[in-house]
């Protein structure tokens, strides 16, 4: 089992010392959140809070995903950084390919490209991208990012994007794992075609159903390649629970030590955060 340290919506000056501490403590990876901006007016709902409220995000600091990962990659040597998750279809896929390929090449293939479709029309409006057909759009984006990060010539002609034969360098020396986030069946189907699935949290029984579904979709598609399953689960906080998750096929447990979905700034001191992640490493990571 691998363990991924999660922190978000906190003082952005904490990220560098937290990444260093997570690497020293034995975590395999760290999640990197993504958000472009917060709208003044919105009636759309957040899918991972009970009431759909997302006002807690107002004013929360989000360093741009690629910028933050580059900074953290420069001060670590082993820790992988998993985007959790990048709102891919609101961005130009060729630019994402250049950013992801450059980043992975620069920090030694330590990038997991977690992607998803933003559920909020405001993100699409801000970036000048139609909200309609976002599922088909992300499918094309994934194919383009894959193709343009190989270091070979690649072309693509689809409904939304037309890429002439093009080569991007530098390219990473290993393929960038593409991990798809989301609980909808369309997201699970997309994940089954990719390199992994990222769980957004929720009911334990629902997690079992989602894991079984994505496994079944991979079997139906004849997929036998290595596949990552990243989950948020209370079972991830005990040795016995981790073993149960392993038995279900989970490869990566995402662990955080506070609930970020709260109003106002995060007031937890840096040293408390570091001690929390160290205690978990001592009590769980070191024993599995």
From Swiss-Prot:
Pfam families associated with the record: Bac_luciferase
Taxonomy, superkingdom: Bacteria
GO molecular function: oxidoreductase activity, acting on paired donors, with incorporation or reduction of molecular oxygen
InterPro entries documented for this protein: Diverse_substr_monoxygenases, Lucif-like_OxRdtase_Rv2161c, Luciferase-like_dom, Luciferase-like_sf
Coiled-coil zones: none
A GO CC term attached to the entry: plasma membrane
Annotated protein name in UniProt: Uncharacterized protein Rv0940c
């Amino acid at each position: 089992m691998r363990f991924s340290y999660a922190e978000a919506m906190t003082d952005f000056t904490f990220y560098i010392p937290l990444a260093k501490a997570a690497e020293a403590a034995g975590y395999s990876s760290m999640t990197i959140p993504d958000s472009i901006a917060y709208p003044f007016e919105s009636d759309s709902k957040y899918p991972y809070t009970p009431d759909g409220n997302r006002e807690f995000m107002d004013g929360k600091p989000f360093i741009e995903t690629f910028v933050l990962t580059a900074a953290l990659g420069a001060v670590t040597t082993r820790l992988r950084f998993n985007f959790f998750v990048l709102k891919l279809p609101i961005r130009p896929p060729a630019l994402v390919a250049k950013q992801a390929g450059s980043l992975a090449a620069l920090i030694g293939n330590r990038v997991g490209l977690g992607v998803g479709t933003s559920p909020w029309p405001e993100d699409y409006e801000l970036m000048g991208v139609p909200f309609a057909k976002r599922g088909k759009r992300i499918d094309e984006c994934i194919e383009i990012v894959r193709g343009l990060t190989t270091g070979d010539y690649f072309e693509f002609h689809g409904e939304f994007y037309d890429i002439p034969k093009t080569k991007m360098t530098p390219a990473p020396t290993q393929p960038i794992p593409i991990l798809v986030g989301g609980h909808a069946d369309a997201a699970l189907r997309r994940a089954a075609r990719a390199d992994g699935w990222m769980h957004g949290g929720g009911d334990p029984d629902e997690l079992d159903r989602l894991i079984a579904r994505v496994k079944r979709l991979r079997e139906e598609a004849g997929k036998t390649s290595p596949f990552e399953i990243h989950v948020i689960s209370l079972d991830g906080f005990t040795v016995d629970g981790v073993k149960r998750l392993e038995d279900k096929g989970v490869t990566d447990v995402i662990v955080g030590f506070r609930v970020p979905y709260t109003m106002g700034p995060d007031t937890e001191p840096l040293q408390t955060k570091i001690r929390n992640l160290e205690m978990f490493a001592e009590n769980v990571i070191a024993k599995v």
